[in-house]
Structure formats: structure tokens, C-alpha cells
Amino acid sequence: NVKITTYVDGVAYSGGYAWASIADEVVVNPMGRVGSIGVVLPLTNYAEKDKKEGVKRIYITSGKSKVPYDEDGNFTEDALDEFRKSSKIIYDEFVGHVAEMRGIDRQSVINTEAKTFDAQQALSLNLIDSIMTKEQFYNHINGKYGENVMSLVQKSNQGEEVVTTTNDSLISTLTE
């Protein structure tokens, strides 16, 4: 039974927050932000641009719903309805995930309206458990687990992620 602690040193928005919320303890830097519990499906309609540039697209398909455009290159209402349904399903799953992982009711998650929150706001909404500087967090972890801590640091162009393990815990530190 491994306990997971996550430290957010920058931001954990949307999918990043979904991952952070699985932790038994979510700690955020005083300057950190979390949230954006929502779904966006960006769709770009190039029909007018194509028309101005003299581009006419032709699709040869099998299956009525294979291409989401009508003959003018605009999204069909059926396609838009399917995108909306898909977005709603993903949103409902996301809300349920956060509610379950954070132990808060679904309506409270829905009431966040996909906004982002500073550390203090997130704490008041129970989206996180505590606010600590990185130094305070390391002292907290050392106090909890003593010297029996091993770290693996992975760097990427997105920032740095430090994964620290003990005999019975996993600590994930997300930094920018």
C-alpha cells in the first residue's frame, strides 16, 4: 500500500491536475496554481479561407461519419453534436475522477467552472492539502520519512520532475 505525495512547484492545470489529484497528499508552492478541470476540443473551420484561396477539398469516404465536414468544408451539425457528446463524457469522467481522488462532491468540482486557482484558493476548495515552499516540502518529507529517501530526477524541456521513493511512498515533484 504505497502512499503518494505530489509537490506542484509551478502549475498543474487540466491533465496535470488530473495526475496530481491521484496523490494521497497534494502540496503546492505558495506561488503555484492548479485547476482548469474542464475539456476543450479546438476545432478550426478553414472553409472561408479555402474558398478565398480557391481550394476545394474532396473527400472519398466509406461510412457516413468518417469526415466531419459538409461539401462546403463546414462542420456538419451531426459532427458538432458528436464532438459535444464526447466533450461531455470526458468532462463527466474528469469531474468524477477529481471528486473521487480528492474526496469532494461532484458539484463542488463542477462549481470550479474550469477556472485556475492560486494556492490559497485551491486550499480553500480542497483541491490541495497544503501550501509549502520547496524547502518546507523537503523538510516535511524528511520529517515524514527520515533518511530513507531515494530520488530519481528526470529533466525535460517542459521542466524538471523529481520522483522520490521510500519503502512505502512515492513523492512526485512537478517543477517548471
Task: Set out the residue ranges of the language-model regions.
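Glycine-rich beta-to-alpha transition loops that act as phosphate-gripper elements at the mouths
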Residues: 7-13, 111-115
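C-terminal intrinsically disordered, low-complexity extensions immediately downstream
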Residues: 135-155, 160
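Small-residue-centered hinge/linker elements
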Residues: 1-2, 11, 17-101, 151-154, ...
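A mature extracytoplasmic/lumenal domain signature
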Residues: 8-12, 129, 135
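Secondary-structure end/capping motifs
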Residues: 87, 91-121
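Well-ordered beta-strand positions
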Residues: 24-25, 85, 114-115, 129-133
